[in-house]
A protein has these predicted regions:
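Alpha-helical transmembrane segments of multi-pass membrane proteins, especially transporters
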Residues: 17, 51-59, 63, 88-104, ...
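A cytosolic-side transmembrane-helix exit/cap motif
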Residues: 68-78, 114, 139-150, 172-173
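Short, Lys/Arg-rich, polar N-terminal cytosolic tail immediately upstream
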Residues: 1-19
Length: 241
């Protein structure tokens, strides 16, 4: 671990973890965003894969487009006044939703070419990604740069896509005894897993395990950071005449 990274971890561990949208601060696991597709339609590995690809095609481009368009009605203050919010929130929300809709119209032919009629398994939840909080939640936040929009968008995409695949594979295995259609067991362990109620149960258990692992990882990083700085200071002390 580099000295600068170690200093950042020890100075503000939560801020350091906040930037890790894949594991330590996954928006679904830690904030409960984007639950509907996970619970309702991520019932198989194939469905999870289709949703993951759709999110990959939608999230970053729509976030960048919305970032550019929302400059027409920017929010500059971290804590805007009620008057500012009343004046700007509605047009910003419309811009973010419209940006996602435009990107969706461009991405759908690609999804249709890759997955064909399999997209029908996603039902209304595919177009509903346009108003998914993961795509639109920024409309009420302070204006961000294009670089930050791309950086955060990529990290959120990876974190969400990973969870979609994991949930889809686990639910398919539990409910059907298969993984991407290939048999991996003699019987279904939990047929309820293919239903939304089972989806909540599976997702809840996975989130609990994920959070526990993330907490362990944070503790490990802090310990490693302390050890790194200790070794660094010892080396500096040995160099002194």
């Amino acid at each position: 671990m580099k000295k600068r990274t170690a200093e950042l971890i020890l100075k503000d561990p939560e801020k350091f973890a906040h930037h890790d949208r894949v594991f330590l601060n996954n928006p679904v696991v830690m904030q409960g965003m984007g639950l509907a597709p996970l619970v309702v339609v991520a019932t198989t590995g194939q469905n999870g894969l289709m949703l993951a690809v759709a999110v990959a095609l939608l999230l970053v481009p729509s976030r960048v487009l919305a970032c550019l368009l929302s400059r027409l009605v920017p929010l500059r203050d971290e804590e805007p006044t009620p008057e500012q919010l009343q004046k700007k929130l509605l047009p910003r929300a419309l811009l973010y939703a419209a940006s996602a809709a435009v990107v969706y119209l461009a991405a759908y032919p690609i999804l249709n070419f890759v997955f064909g009629t399999g997209l029908l398994n996603l039902g209304i939840y595919l177009p509903m990604l346009v108003v998914e909080p993961l795509l639109t939640y920024r409309f009420g936040r302070v204006q961000e740069t294009v670089h930050k929009a791309v950086s955060k968008g990529v990290r959120i995409t990876v974190g969400y896509a990973l969870l979609l695949l994991v949930v889809g594979v686990v639910r398919e295995w539990l409910s059907l005894g298969t993984v991407f259609g290939a048999p991996v067991g003699r019987w279904a362990l939990l047929p309820l897993a293919k239903m939304p109620a089972g989806g909540f149960i599976v997702l809840g258990i996975l989130c609990a395990i994920w959070r526990a692992a993330a907490a362990k990882r944070k503790e490990y990083l802090k310990k490693e950071a302390r050890d790194t700085l200790t070794v660094h200071y010892q080396k500096e002390g040995n160099r002194e005449p």
